């Protein structure tokens, strides 16, 4: 059987970033920049005050005969406006935070270091000498014209949104979101709103995968369930090929009714269909026509784990990401992993930072049908191939799915 690493490499070799498009800034969150972003002007575009206070010449703040200098207040400037006159020797202007520094002034003293008879007084005493540039934010201090601010391939988060807005990008060049078809298979599968009947199970996988696809940044399309007939699968695949990626659950094992691989071979190709891992050995990859297809196992835990290992990196590459994989950390496994499994074993666990190290505890029964083992899981402990056991208190690698708050 193929290793996890080889399977992932073969899958990703067939995946390309999708075409670029322009989206409104308000819709760019989570997408990937399709070009470098270069500042077209200085930010801030003008020198402005970092404090409420007075704009003056720094030399006018020096004491005179041991006494605080007294300056005439000739006006004021608020944020959003410009001064209608210059500051000259012996004069000053009131200034608000963010307001442009008036011509002639080379420093700003905060109001707390001044003294006036009343807020509207025409005279102010300067109680402390201040150097040139004090409390002034120079034009271009944050970004200067011609500077590359964001790089192609950067993911757009809330802070990037703020920077793009500051630079005036109302529409943003991005790699477009993938549209992903999600298809359940099997005569035994019914929808979630149907009453359970003997021999039937609810279509939990399609809803789980829909949510996982959305969290990965793509747009999911649930296509329902294909029955265990060639005709039903062909009909569903005809609908699915309008999308960028097809993800199925079930139908890729070795049973008489596991037909997905056969239809893949008929309408496209099968690259591989078994991986040396648990849970999730029966994973298939290939295509229907020119659309890549990732066939995940029918057991819900297997579908969830294999999506994290293979489906999520595929979507991230389609989105234009260059960092595709979840991070791994070294953990101490408090309760150990005693089951001997010859395949690579991904054990559901909860990892937290405790006493200067990452500590992991497994989430109970690790059967591939035990969906409750996915609850309170934020990591997968990686147990190497070959029947390796991890003793209680032993060390292992863990693939982090989320980072717990502290």
Model-derived regions: residue spans:
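Helix-rich terminal scaffold detector
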Residues: 1-5, 170-296, 300-306
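Generic structural signal for well-ordered, non-membrane alpha-helical segments
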Residues: 1-4, 8, 21, 25, ...
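Structural signal for hydrophobic packing residues in well-ordered secondary-structure cores
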Residues: 12-19, 36, 147, 153, ...
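Short, glycine/charged-enriched hinge/interface segments at domain edges or termini
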Residues: 2, 55-222, 359-360, 364, ...
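Solvent-exposed alpha-helices and their adjacent loops that cap or buttress functional pockets
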Residues: 47-49, 62-66, 84-88, 101-103, ...
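Short, low-complexity N-terminal leaders and the immediately following helix N-cap/first helix
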Residues: 1-65, 94, 138, 316, ...
């Amino acid at each position: 059987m193929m290793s996890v690493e080889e399977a992932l490499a073969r899958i990703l070799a067939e995946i390309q970033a999708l075409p670029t498009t322009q989206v409104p800034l308000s819709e760019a969150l989570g997408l990937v920049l399709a070009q470098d972003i270069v500042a077209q002007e200085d930010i801030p575009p003008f020198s402005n005050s970092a404090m409420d206070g007075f704009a003056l010449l720094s030399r006018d703040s020096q004491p005179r005969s041991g006494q605080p200098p007294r300056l005439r207040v000739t006006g004021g400037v608020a944020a959003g406006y410009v001064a209608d006159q210059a500051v000259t020797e012996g004069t000053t202007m009131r200034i608000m935070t963010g307001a442009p520094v008036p011509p002639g002034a080379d420093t700003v003293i905060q109001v707390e270091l001044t003294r006036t008879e009343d807020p509207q007084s025409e005279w102010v005493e300067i109680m402390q000498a201040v150097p040139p540039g004090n409390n002034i934010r120079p034009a271009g201090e944050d970004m200067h014209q011609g500077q590359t601010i964001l790089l192609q391939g950067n993911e757009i988060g809330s802070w990037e949104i703020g920077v793009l807005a500051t630079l005036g990008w109302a529409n943003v060049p991005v790699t477009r979101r993938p549209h992903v078809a999600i298809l359940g298979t099997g005569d035994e599968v019914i929808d979630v709103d149907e009453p359970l009947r003997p021999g039937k199970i609810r279509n939990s996988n399609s809803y789980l995968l829909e949510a996982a696809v959305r969290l990965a940044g793509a747009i999911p399309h649930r296509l329902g369930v294909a029955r265990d007939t060639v005709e039903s699968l062909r009909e569903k695949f005809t609908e699915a090929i309008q999308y960028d990626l097809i993800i199925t659950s079930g139908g890729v094992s070795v049973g008489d009714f596991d037909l997905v691989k056969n239809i893949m071979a008929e309408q496209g190709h099968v690259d591989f269909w078994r991986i040396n891992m648990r849970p999730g050995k029966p994973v298939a990859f290939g295509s229907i026509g020119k659309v890549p297809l990732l066939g995940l196992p029918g057991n819900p835990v297997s579908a969830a784990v294999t999506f994290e290992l293979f489906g999520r990196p595929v979507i991230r590459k389609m989105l234009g990401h260059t960092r595709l994989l979840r991070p791994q950390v070294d953990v101490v496994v408090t309760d150990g992993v005693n089951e001997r499994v010859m395949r690579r074993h991904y054990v559901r666990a909860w990892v937290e930072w405790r006493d200067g190290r990452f500590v992991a505890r497994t989430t109970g029964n690790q059967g591939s049908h035990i969906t409750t083992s996915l609850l309170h899981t934020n990591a997968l402990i990686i147990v190497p191939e070959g029947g390796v056991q991890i003793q209680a208190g032993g060390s292992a690698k863990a693939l982090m799915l989320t980072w717990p708050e502290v």
